[in-house]
Regions:
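Active-site neighborhood of HAD-like aspartate-dependent phosphohydrolases
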Residues: 1-44, 61
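Asp-based, Mg2+/Mn2+-dependent phosphohydrolase catalytic module
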Residues: 1-5, 93, 97, 110-111, ...
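Conserved SAM-binding loop
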Residues: 15, 103, 162-163
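Short beta->alpha linker loops
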Residues: 21, 46, 50, 73, ...
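Hydrophobic alpha-helical core bundles mediating ligand binding, dimerization, or RNAP-core interactions
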Residues: 26, 30, 51, 55, ...
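Helix-loop "lid/cap" segments that line or gate small-molecule binding pockets
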Residues: 29-30, 50-65, 117, 150, ...
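Short, acidic loop-to-helix structural element flanking the phosphoryl-transfer center
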Residues: 80-105, 111, 115
C-alpha cells in the first residue's frame, strides 16, 4: 500500500455542512430567473461543481443569462446565511489534529468563499493551504484541481488521499491517480440517488463519521507494513 503523505479535503459537505444552505440559495436565485429547478435536481446535477458550470448550464439548457447581478445576489445571500448558520462537520477539527499528516483544501468554490467558510467555523488556522477551481483551467470532474494542489504541496498524486462528498469530486480524484474516500455525513447525504451514485463510482472507502478517517488512514499504514 502506498504511503499517504497528503490528505486533500473538499470543503463544502466535507469540512463544513454548507450544502443545504448553498443549494437553497441557488435554487431560489435560479427560480427567480425563471429556471424551473428543484433542490433534488440541483444536488443531482451540480453537487461538487463550480458556479461557472451552473451558469453555463443555465445558458445552454434553459437559455437564461446569469449576469453580474445574479452573482452578486448569490454572494450576498449566501455569505449572509453562512455567517449566521454555517457549522463545521462534527469532529473535523479533532480529526485534522489527529491525522498528523499534511492537509490542504481543494474546492470548486471561490477562494473568498472557502476562506469565509473556514473562518466562520474556526478551521482556517488548521488549513492554511487552500486551492480553488478558479486556479485551474478545468473544474471537477477533471483532475486539474487535485493535481494542482498536489504539485503545490510537493506530493506525488499516488501519495495523496482525497476526501470528497460529490460524484464529480470522486471522478476528479480518480482521474488524478489519487485514492479517494467518500464522506457521507453531511446534512445533504439523504437526497435521492446519492448513495447509489457514490457506490457506482467505487471510492476506496465510504464513511459517515469524520473521526473514522483517522482509522482509515491508519489502516492504510498497517496494510503497507504487512503486504
Amino acid at each position: 500500500m502506498t504511503e499517504t503523505r497528503l490528505v486533500i479535503f473538499d470543503c463544502d459537505g466535507v469540512l463544513v455542512d454548507s450544502e443545504p444552505i448553498s443549494v437553497n440559495v441557488l435554487v431560489k436565485a435560479m427560480n427567480d430567473l425563471g429556471v424551473p429547478i428543484t433542490e433534488d435536481e440541483v444536488y443531482g446535477r451540480f453537487l461538487g461543481k463550480s458556479l461557472a458550470t451552473v451558469i453555463e448550464t443555465m445558458k445552454s439548457d434553459y437559455h437564461v443569462h446569469a449576469g453580474e447581478e445574479f452573482l452578486e445576489r448569490m454572494r450576498v445571500d449566501l455569505y449572509g446565511r453562512f455567517r449566521k448558520e454555517l457549522r463545521p462537520i462534527e469532529g473535523i477539527g479533532e480529526t485534522i489534529d489527529a491525522l498528523d499528516i499534511p492537509c490542504c483544501v481543494a474546492s470548486s468554490s471561490q477562494v473568498e468563499r472557502i476562506k469565509l467558510s473556514l473562518s466562520v467555523t474556526g478551521l482556517i488556522g488548521k488549513l492554511p493551504n487552500i486551492f480553488s477551481a478558479s486556479m485551474v483551467k478545468n473544474g471537477k470532474p477533471a483532475p486539474d484541481l487535485f493535481l494542482h494542489a498536489a504539485r503545490e504541496m510537493q506530493v506525488e498524486p499516488k501519495n495523496c488521499v482525497v476526501v470528497e462528498d460529490s460524484p464529480a469530486g470522486i471522478e476528479a480524484a480518480k482521474a488524478a491517480g489519487m485514492r479517494v474516500f467518500a464522506f457521507t455525513g453531511g446534512s445533504h447525504a439523504n437526497f435521492e440517488g446519492y448513495r447509489a451514485e457514490l457506490d457506482r463510482l467505487s471510492p476506496e472507502a465510504v464513511f459517515d463519521v469524520m473521526p473514522e478517517l483517522i482509522h482509515l488512514i491508519q489502516k492504510q499504514k498497517l496494510d503497507g507494513m504487512h503486504p
